[in-house]
């Protein structure tokens, strides 16, 4: 079972040899068996990667994330085919019933708000009960935008009344970074299950390649929020990014069994 998150932060060459990712830099050579790797993040732009390695990573369904010169996630490696019956699944996805899509989206919003309420409860914030009230007011497809109202109450309670998601600050940098990583994990699982990330339940932006991922990840956003709240960043640099990545190895209970964050996403996407 893959479980490692490997982050490449400095000038190096990545190669493939006998089932291993080989990382060479001026100081050392390190090998990691590909079967152990769940996510590979290439944070530095001064990294060279062989085509042989990329092919093996794709075959083993390792999520590869490339960052820009500011070390922010920019793109990812996604296979054309993730399942032997993907053509059949895509046909079914295209034909998804509109009412069913709306019902599923309503449930996703309910779970997201519920998790946000649990986060506020963890920090003993009274607005938790207000968010639970929004769940009772939910309409089909969230026509009254309870999600938006809940978000405003939630973020102001969690990070202060002066906080805005539009601000350029370390907290938002950490949140956006974390959400990008979670989105990438969902992209991998959706593709691995043979579906298109472009065709969503609610999100329907013609310029967004990840509409379905944006839909399904919503209940998982609060886990990033907790990590950022506990971090309380006054800057967002290498140390803070590593802390965000550690979220992928956090453990959860599902049906009485302990699962990592990545495995929890895998189970969720298959359900």
List each model region and its residues:
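Short, extreme N-terminal leader segments that mark the start of a protein/domain
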Residues: 1-41, 49
